[in-house]
Amino acid sequence: MTYAESTRSAVVYSSIVPPPRTPVGPPMLKDGVRKGSASQPLQPKNGANSLDYWSKSEDEKSGITCYYSRHNIQFPPPQRKMKPVKPNPVGRSTINGFTPSTSSPQNGLRYPPFPQNTPESVMSPPVGIYRNIPAMPRAKLTKDEKNGGKMNRDGGGENPKNVVWGGTSRKDDDTASTPLNSFSANASIEKKRSTARRKPRWARCFQTLFCCVTPPREIEKIQSSQRTNSTNNNHQNGRPSTPTNTGPPIQLITQVHRDGTVTGLPTTGQACQQNGSGDGVTPYDKIANDSVGTINEKPLLPPLLPQDSNKKCLVIDLDETLVHSSFKPVKNPDFVIPVEIDGVEHQVYVLKRPYVDEFLAKVGEHFECILFTASLAKYADPVADLLDKKRVFRGRLFREACVFHKGNYVKDLSRLGRNLNQTLIIDNSPASYAFHPENAVPVTTWFDDPSDTELLDILPSLEHLNGFSSIYDLYRPEEGPQSELLNHCSC
């Protein structure tokens, strides 16, 4: 037996299969209440439970008798989930052989099912009777109810995108679906689970619109050049620029490793910018192309002191010649130098080469000693302070004084302001004295060998060279310097 529920139920439910049970009529009720249930009168107490309050309807085909009330008695809708049913074949009556009435409720009257307090196992599900709703399966929600529209009460119109008619989805068969019921909590939970958010397409539209005018790669180049120009302007105006991470801390020190590789060397473009040239020409290339008499470059060293006027100039390297430094902790370091790089403080562990103190004390008596290193001053200057306690070095030159030539830092002795025939260089890297190999006293690279005696072994050679008026007198004429540039003195 079928009863009408309410106006809202008529929109939600469309068809139902009647349960097999005996119809309940007025003779089976006592005072408007089903036998065996709680006392809840459905009609005024002063009125009798007569057929005047009920209307009777019979179906000849199915043999079902229906009783319905016309009184303004309102009951809350049943909180019961309904299972979807299969659609009725075309050509048959839409609701159990009855054609639903097209009349709308008057004076706000609602027609609830009867009886209300009947157990759920006995009650018939409500159906709508106010409109001619065609029989169809119930709609199911798939993913997101926001993308779809509401059901058309008349059954017409285009189906929403997220509503699936029937048992499975058209887009994704594996997507879980729930019945479209405005009174069930599953629909609200499904709304909360919706996480699909559409991104705005304005950026794509602008990119598509202006792609021919300025491609994305060109935009990145322009932004990069603007950042570089702003950084250069800050340096020129004396304002601190934003610190940038130029690489690992190992670039602070120029070192020769055990495998022969050299770290701390910049790229060719960076070296040209450091040397003030953007065309790839180094200062040495300019010196080599110019005549000797037209060079007016300022010397790197100050004039000779009176006590050093009769001494030869001895240029000494620092890393792997006198000391070995590492950013990794070592056992029993001689010095630990704190160095700040990009706002972060790093610890540099320094080991002194064996007999370095005796070596510096000996050469300081006979030579004008100059410290020349390809490392940065923020690291090399504190190391020199701890290493040279007797102030043997008359001057200190760092990476800024080197010339970057063919991928290496070269120490150009012609820029010192000393006579080349009175200048010697001690270095473990042949690339450092590539411009003046005849002035070099090579030494082996030292890392951590405690039995090394290289510094003591070269002392006799230095004393022997100091006895000549010119270091080139040691060579035969065919082995001497072949270029006027090597004999040039800029003092």
Swiss-Prot record:
Record-annotated FCP1 homology domain positions: 307-465
Region (Disordered): 1-53, 140-198, 221-249, 261-282
EC number assigned by the record: 3.1.3.16
Cofactor binding note from Swiss-Prot or TrEMBL: May also use Mn(2+).
Gene (name only): scpl-1
Residue numbers marked as site, Transition state stabilizer: 373, 411
Reactions performed catalytically: O-phospho-L-seryl-[protein] + H2O = L-seryl-[protein] + phosphate; O-phospho-L-threonyl-[protein] + H2O = L-threonyl-[protein] + phosphate
Name of this chain's protein: CTD small phosphatase-like protein 1
Listed Pfam families: NIF
Biased composition (Pro residues): 17-26
